[in-house]
């Protein structure tokens, strides 16, 4: 029997017992030998999950053991080689007092229940990183009955949920990830979703608008006759920082009773995004993190969300400064925030900002998606995005997704057309029902101290539908 014990932390250990895995290990024993630490070793080889594993083991010590579960029963493994390019080699052999697993369990200073193998592996895996639970089975819907509680704040008739979160100090090389799970709780349609944090380092924040109304937020005007609340940075206001933009599928789980030949619907849709770019805005701080799903359904949607911090030895350059410039996702749509129609004017969006020192290797993290109308609307027509810094074009591209049909099994309530396609199959302006939209990193180079104006223009179509 193989007994594994892992000390997760000072006050908790986990144990599993397995009587079959050693017997299932199959090796090809080869004639090659070599000496490691003065002991003659023989070679065994096996293939696991398309990986070739070579073990060099000795029987001269009359003990058995290995760096991993693999080879525990063939002798004392002193070297393990994976695919010829990853090597673990013993550097020292030291005799210690024999320890029986049963005694180790008995003498343990912590209580440790014997777990099944899958649960054991899961707990050991999760112990390697820090998990910050944000939301668990929270409803995002449209209802006058939506109320805040001690931990979750609700705004815009329940379409926004908000929580104050304290983040640990994150080291320079750590990686941060955002995970969100969504299910329909009644709404059958694909909806815009956004996960965001609220900067509070200026005189006014977006939280003021949530609490006092969108009309209290700074107004942006570009000459098209409309007023847009809280979308661009000013000297006294920072807009929302969007951690992830995602799109719900058509009615996942709630509408899985809809039957189609050879379609086995998924019951939940997972979204996962690397948010390491926002490390400096999160590390060691207490901030408001929110999620928005635009909908007018009383049942709405159900979500769970975590943020995880992963230790890493990555040598890649890490951001050391984060400046929010604009966010046109109108998360307060259901509380009067104007829809982002500003791109119907040639001026588009302009934001002016000032840097008090040089910033090297600056980049703009840009998320763009097109919406509105039917077959001729911006959702279904490619539109060129052009970005200019101080009047000079720095980037342009046409955001477009052509792989939406790959996510059909997330979309049970997607409408089917006479041409053999379903609504969720159709290509769209940089998004698909049931996916997150990937940010674009735009290189700005080294920015000297001074004042800059960033402009974004998109040839927005006329209203339709």
Name each model-derived stretch:
Residues 1-124:
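Extended soluble regions of mature proteins
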Residues 105-465:
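Extracellular/secretory-pathway and virion-surface proteins
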């Amino acid at each position: 029997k193989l007994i594994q014990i892992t000390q997760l932390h000072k006050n908790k250990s986990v144990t599993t017992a397995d009587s079959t895995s050693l017997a299932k290990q199959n090796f090809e024993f080869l004639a090659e030998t070599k000496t490691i630490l003065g002991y003659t070793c023989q070679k065994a080889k096996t293939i696991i999950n398309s990986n070739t594993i070579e073990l060099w083991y000795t029987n001269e010590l009359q003990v058995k053991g290995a760096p991993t579960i693999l080879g525990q029963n063939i002798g004392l493994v002193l070297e393990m080689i994976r695919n010829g390019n990853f090597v673990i080699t013993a550097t020292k052999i030291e005799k210690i007092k024999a320890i029986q697993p049963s005694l180790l369990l008995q003498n343990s200073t912590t209580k440790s229940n014997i777990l099944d193998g899958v649960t054991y592996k899961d707990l050991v895996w999760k112990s390697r990183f820090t998990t910050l639970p944000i939301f668990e089975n929270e409803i995002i819907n449209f209802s006058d009955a939506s109320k805040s509680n001690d931990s979750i704040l609700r705004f815009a008739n329940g379409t926004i949920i908000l929580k104050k979160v304290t983040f640990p100090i994150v080291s320079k090389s750590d990686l941060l990830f955002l995970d969100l799970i969504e299910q329909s709780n009644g709404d059958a349609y694909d909806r815009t979703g956004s996960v965001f944090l609220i900067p509070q380092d200026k005189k006014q924040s977006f939280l003021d608008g949530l609490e006092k109304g969108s009309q209290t937020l700074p107004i942006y005007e570009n000459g098209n006759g409309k007023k847009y609340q809280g979308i661009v940075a000013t000297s006294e206001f920072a807009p929302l920082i969007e951690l992830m933009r995602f799109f719900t599928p058509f009615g996942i789980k709630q509408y899985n009773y809809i039957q189609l030949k050879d379609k086995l619907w998924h019951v939940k849709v997972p979204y996962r995004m690397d948010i390491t770019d926002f490390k400096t805005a999160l590390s060691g701080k207490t901030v408001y993190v929110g999620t928005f799903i635009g909908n007018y359904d009383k049942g709405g949607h159900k979500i769970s969300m975590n943020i995880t911090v992963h230790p890493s030895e990555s040598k890649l350059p890490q951001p050391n400064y984060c400046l929010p410039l604009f966010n046109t996702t109108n998360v307060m749509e259901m509380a009067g925030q104007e829809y982002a129609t500003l791109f119907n004017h040639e001026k588009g969006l302009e934001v002016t900002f000032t840097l008090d020192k040089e910033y090297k290797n600056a980049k703009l993290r840009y998320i763009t998606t097109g919406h509105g109308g039917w077959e001729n609307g911006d959702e279904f027509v490619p539109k060129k995005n052009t970005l200019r810094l101080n009047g000079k074009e720095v980037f342009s591209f046409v955001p477009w997704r052509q792989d939406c049909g790959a996510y059909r099994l997330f979309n049970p309530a997607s409408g089917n057309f006479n041409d053999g396609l379903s609504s969720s199959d159709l290509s769209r302006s940089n998004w698909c029902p049931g996916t997150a939209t990937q940010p674009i990193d735009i290189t700005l180079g080294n920015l000297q101290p001074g004042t800059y104006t960033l402009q974004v223009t998109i040839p927005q179509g006329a209203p339709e539908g």
